[in-house]
């Protein structure tokens, strides 16, 4: 660019253009996604420069080629295609730097960092490329879908979710302000419904979440094992990992402590500042939603470019019927193994549960972190004798706490066998951005931090269960228990009933079948799966998915005799190819 600025037209043609054509083009390299979009943007510059300074129309062929590349980048890629899943996926999330584990590429969710760069380049191109050089109508339609169906669910109250930023989480506070710019450019290309969604996005990016219509309910991004749910007064994002996906990466000296990101991490927000700048002071062994052994002076594993960030099992994924969203996984990581973990979200509540947690091999305490966020105001908590207490600073560990209030959320603690021991902590923590990013500031940052953790005894069948509700007060009616685990052997089925529908994660179908027969229930799945069933009179609306992404069908027993022998089965055909893992909805009648 410096050469282009200072050279004459003839010198440009002789020196700059040949150099640019050789080093930055869309036809001689194997770039994908955002990296390919960068090359296309530079090719637009040098092709126009060459044409204007030489008068040779042949250079416009390179301009058209760059436009074709940008159009192609708007289209979903195949997970097992030549891009190895890097770019826009069929669920309209964006992947980049997918990590190779053996012979399989594991998807890395990167909508907020590389994805933002990709969309910036495409939108810039769409603005300047006109007439015969315009992006195709199909490309612009798909670009609208990427913004509306993808990006729009990943931001709330002017902030972007940590999960979608990869190693860029170590650079600063992720904002979603750029979405408004894209939405404004795309409005002329959108149909009526998407115009309404884009206008809602423009309003939301300035922090106004007061009147969401389109962005109400949930989305499950099946390619990346990722949940986004926007309730009436809050938003939750959760990430699972499997043999198909990773939770992030380190690289170039960035994000060396991100090993547990995606391992059940769950972030809650209602005003957007819950995690404002917390990264340098975080205890990275206590990320919200994770169940982790607390190892002193922990040596962080190598996670360069996603290595070791993949999950341990096929079972990871979820289901959404629009109003309710569920994400589950089985995970073994370090000495904490075979944990069944689930997040279930409705309009006014998030329920999180874990069972079957094997900690027999650990050397140090194991905790499930309910939350670790910026402390705002005192913490109030309720003991089992219904006495209210306040913790302004310090740490409290007890086994008689039933609910905790902090910064607009009530955390209700349930239990399966015995009441859990929990630790509430409010204290200042210090760190530096350079601790998590080689290019970060070395100056010490000190912030007040609230954390709530559940302790696990050493053994083979650990568990936890809690719900979180947006609330203005500790005793604001948010304490009704909503989560129930029907224990079959090792609690292999997680169930929540919200008054209208039942949300279920079935990890072991055989134990579920035995429990259903013993309990006299006539409806149960015949294989591990996740589903939401809503009954209205004699009709049941069933939304289901296969988290292993290996099955062609799901079978459900909907009627059995008194001995539990199946009489009527429902077989649901599942999507295949790049759609595998997507939810399917069917309706059936019951007697």
Model-inferred region functions:
Residues 564-570:
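Surface-exposed loop/edge segments in extracytoplasmic proteins
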Residues 118, 125-564:
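Extended polysaccharide-engagement surfaces of secreted carbohydrate-active enzymes
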Residues 223, 402, 462-467, 575-591:
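C-terminal beta-strand-rich structural cap/linker in extracellular carbohydrate-active enzymes
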Residues 1-4, 43, 122, 495-497, ...:
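Generic low-polarity alpha-helical segments
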Residues 1-175:
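Aromatic-lined, polymer-binding surfaces characteristic
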Residues 542, 556, 572, 586-588:
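Preference for bulky hydrophobic residues occupying beta-strand positions
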Residues 54-65, 471-476, 577-581:
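Alpha-helix capping and helix-coil boundary motifs
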């Amino acid at each position: 660019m410096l050469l282009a600025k200072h050279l004459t037209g003839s010198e440009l043609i002789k020196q700059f253009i040949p150099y640019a054509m050789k080093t930055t083009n869309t036809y001689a390299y194997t770039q994908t996604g955002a990296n390919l979009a960068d090359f296309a943007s530079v090719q637009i510059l040098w092709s126009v420069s060459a044409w204007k300074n030489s008068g040779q129309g042949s250079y416009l062929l390179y301009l058209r080629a760059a436009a074709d590349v940008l159009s192609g980048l708007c289209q979903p890629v195949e997970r097992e295609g030549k891009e190895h899943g890097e770019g826009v996926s069929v669920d309209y999330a964006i992947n980049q730097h997918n990590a190779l584990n053996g012979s399989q590429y594991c998807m890395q969710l990167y909508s907020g960092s590389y994805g933002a760069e990709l969309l910036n380049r495409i939108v810039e191109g769409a603005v300047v490329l006109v007439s015969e050089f315009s992006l195709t109508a199909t490309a612009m339609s798909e670009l609208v879908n990427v913004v509306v169906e993808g990006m729009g669910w990943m931001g709330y109250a002017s902030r972007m979710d940590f999960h979608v930023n990869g190693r860029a989480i170590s650079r600063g506070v992720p904002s979603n302000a750029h979405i408004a710019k894209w939405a404004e450019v795309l409005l002329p290309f959108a149909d009526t419904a998407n115009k309404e969604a884009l206008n809602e996005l423009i309003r939301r990016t300035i922090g106004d979440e007061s009147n969401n219509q389109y962005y109400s309910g949930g989305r499950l991004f099946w390619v990346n094992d990722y949940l986004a749910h926007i309730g009436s007064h809050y938003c939750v994002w959760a990430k699972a990992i499997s043999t198909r996906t990773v939770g992030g990466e380190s690289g170039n000296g960035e994000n060396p402590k991100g090993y547990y990101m995606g391992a059940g991490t769950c972030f809650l927000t209602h005003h957007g500042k819950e995690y404002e700048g917390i990264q340098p002071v975080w205890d990275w062994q206590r990320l919200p939603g994770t169940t982790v052994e607390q190892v002193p002076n922990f040596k962080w594993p190598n996670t360069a470019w996603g290595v070791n960030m993949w999950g341990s099992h096929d079972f990871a994924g979820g289901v959404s019927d629009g109003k309710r969203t569920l994400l589950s996984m089985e995970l073994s990581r370090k000495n904490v193994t075979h944990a069944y973990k689930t997040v279930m979200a409705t309009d006014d509540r998030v329920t999180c549960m874990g069972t079957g947690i094997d900690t027999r091999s650990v050397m140090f305490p194991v905790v499930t972190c309910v939350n670790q966020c910026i402390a705002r105001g005192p913490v109030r908590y309720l003991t089992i004798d219904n006495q209210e207490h306040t913790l302004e600073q310090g740490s409290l560990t007890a086994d008689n706490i039933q609910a905790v209030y902090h910064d607009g959320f009530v955390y209700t603690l349930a239990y399966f066998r015995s009441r859990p021991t929990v630790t509430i902590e409010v204290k200042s923590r210090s760190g530096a951005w350079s601790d998590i990013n080689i290019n970060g500031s070395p100056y010490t940052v000190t912030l007040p931090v609230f954390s709530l953790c559940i302790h696990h005894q050493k053994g083979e069948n650990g568990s936890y269960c809690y719900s979180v509700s947006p609330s203005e007060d500790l005793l604001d009616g948010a304490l009704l228990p909503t989560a129930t685990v029907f224990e079959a052997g090792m609690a292999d089925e997680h169930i929540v009933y919200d008054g209208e529908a039942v949300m279920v994660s079935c990890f072991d179908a055989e134990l579920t079948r035995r429990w259903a027969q013993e309990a006299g229930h006539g409806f149960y799945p015949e294989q591990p799966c996740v589903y939401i069933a809503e009954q209205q009179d004699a009709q049941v609306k069933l939304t289901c998915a296969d988290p292993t992404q290996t099955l062609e069908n799901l079978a459900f027993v909907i009627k059995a005799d008194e001995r539990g022998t199946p009489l009527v089965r429902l077989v649901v055909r599942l999507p295949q190819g790049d759609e595998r893992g997507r939810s399917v909805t069917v309706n059936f009648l019951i007697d």
